[in-house]
A protein has these predicted regions:
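Hydrophobic pocket-lining residues within nucleotide cofactor-binding pockets
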Residues: 27, 73, 120
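Short glycine/serine/threonine-biased micro-segments
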Residues: 24, 68-69, 116
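Auxiliary Fe-S-binding modules of radical SAM enzymes
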Residues: 7-16, 60-61, 78-80, 91-155
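N-terminal [4Fe-4S]-dependent radical SAM core
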Residues: 1-23, 28, 36-40, 155
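Conserved Radical SAM active-site core
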Residues: 2-9, 36-95, 101-107
Length: 155
């Protein structure tokens, strides 16, 4: 089980989507220079399918995507939540921002429509910087994903 601390509607994290961002706590990555160090501690409320249903009801018609920000402490649970959302709320896309270098082999990529991989490395910058090590992928077909990171770069 994972906990979340807060949520927010965001427009930049996933291109062409109005995204409900869910900040998951207990991050094991501990990236130096992290701008969300408050998410390192395992605090907040349990993130359950019932909580997701409430978010969807609260933002009905306003969001097109739900993004799990973190969850690296339990990727299998993040995948289960993604499966639940696709089954119960098929109109929504599901994204996962992970600090991992690679996608965990123990879960299915196709449970997600978007996946961000890579730890934050301060001197390389975040996704909007051309120098970033992080990558944002969009599902193309099946388990195939296309790198769309360049869509986030500052012009």
């Amino acid at each position: 089980m994972l906990n979340y601390l807060n949520t927010g509607i965001v427009f930049q994290e996933i291109p062409d989507e109005v995204t409900l961002s869910i900040n998951i706590t207990g991050c094991p990555c501990r990236c130096p220079g992290c701008h969300s160090q408050y998410l390192w501690e395992n605090i907040g409320e349990p993130l359950t399918p019932m909580v997701l249903d409430q978010f969807v009801a609260n933002y009905h018609g306003e969001i097109t995507c739900i993004c799990f920000m973190g969850g690296d402490a339990d990727p299998k649970y993040v995948s289960q939540l993604a499966q639940y959302l696709h089954r119960e709320h098929p109109q929504l896309k599901v994204a996962w921002y992970s600090g991992r270098q690679q996608f965990p082999r123990t879960i299915r990529k196709r449970d997600f429509d978007y996946i961000k991989l890579g730890p934050y490395i301060e001197h390389l910058g975040c996704l909007k910087e051309r120098t970033t090590n992080q990558r944002l992928y969009k599902r193309a077909a099946g388990d195939d994903f296309t790198d769309i990171t360049s869509r986030l770069w500052k012009k």
